[in-house]
């Protein structure tokens, strides 16, 4: 399963729930697959989607907030996981797409083959799940509908050579439409 296939499945299952999406190819794929006003695309802030997602979850306790992170992104900001685990937002679902690569910056390897991200998440009070194929991912997405967070879902994906188009919406417009979507 590649990133785009995983994003298609997840967005189909979660509907219009808000998504804070990390920078790079992840945001491009989400934009291509399912652009909506409830998506907040990180255009350039590597490693900060989880921190922003936490703030959004705290201020919007009645909405389920999804964070889409890459393995490279979360490894840059592991401290956010300890903060999330301490605050324990019941409405936060942290999805980490793991291809063992900083794919957006040239494909350099991350340490995710050596570092057990789900054990780190579990040690800081997340409920953890791992999906390595579409069937398992769909099963987990159905299961977590009735779970409270924080939830950590690692999705093992393959690298891809297909690069999505750049997001053609001004970052100010992305912010404005996302903010409006939260008050509706």
What are these regions (language model features)?
Residues 31-98:
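Thiamine diphosphate
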Residues 1-5, 25, 47, 51, ...:
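Conserved active-site and cofactor/substrate-binding residues in soluble primary-metabolism enzymes
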Residues 108-143:
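Conserved thiamine diphosphate
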Residues 20-22, 68-69, 94-98, 154-158:
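Short beta-strand segments
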Residues 9, 80-84, 140-143:
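A short acidic, amphipathic alpha-helical/loop segment
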Residues 1-46:
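Active-site diphosphate/adenylate-binding microenvironment
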Residues 99-107:
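Long, charge-dense
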Residues 36, 146-184:
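Glycine/aspartate-rich loop-and-adjacent alpha/beta segment that forms the canonical ThDP
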């Amino acid at each position: 399963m590649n990133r785009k296939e995983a994003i298609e499945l997840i967005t189909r299952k979660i509907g219009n729930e808000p998504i804070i999406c990390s920078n790079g190819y992840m945001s491009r794929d989400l934009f291509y697959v399912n652009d909506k006003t409830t998506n907040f695309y990180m255009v350039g802030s590597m490693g900060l989607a989880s921190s922003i997602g936490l703030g959004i979850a705290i201020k919007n306790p009645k909405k389920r907030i999804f964070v889409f992170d890459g393995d490279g992104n979360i490894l840059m900001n592991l401290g956010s996981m300890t903060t999330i685990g301490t605050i324990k937002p019941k409405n936060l679902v942290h999805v980490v797409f793991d291809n063992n690569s900083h794919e957006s910056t040239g494909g350099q390897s991350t340490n995710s083959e050596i570092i057990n991200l789900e054990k780190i998440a579990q040690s800081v009070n997340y409920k953890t799940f791992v999906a390595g194929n579409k069937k398992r991912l769909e099963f987990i997405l159905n299961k977590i509908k009735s779970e409270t967070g924080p939830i950590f879902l690692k999705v093992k994906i393959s690298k891809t050579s297909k690069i999505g188009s750049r997001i053609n919406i001004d970052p100010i417009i992305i912010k404005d439409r996302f903010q409006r979507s939260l008050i509706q």
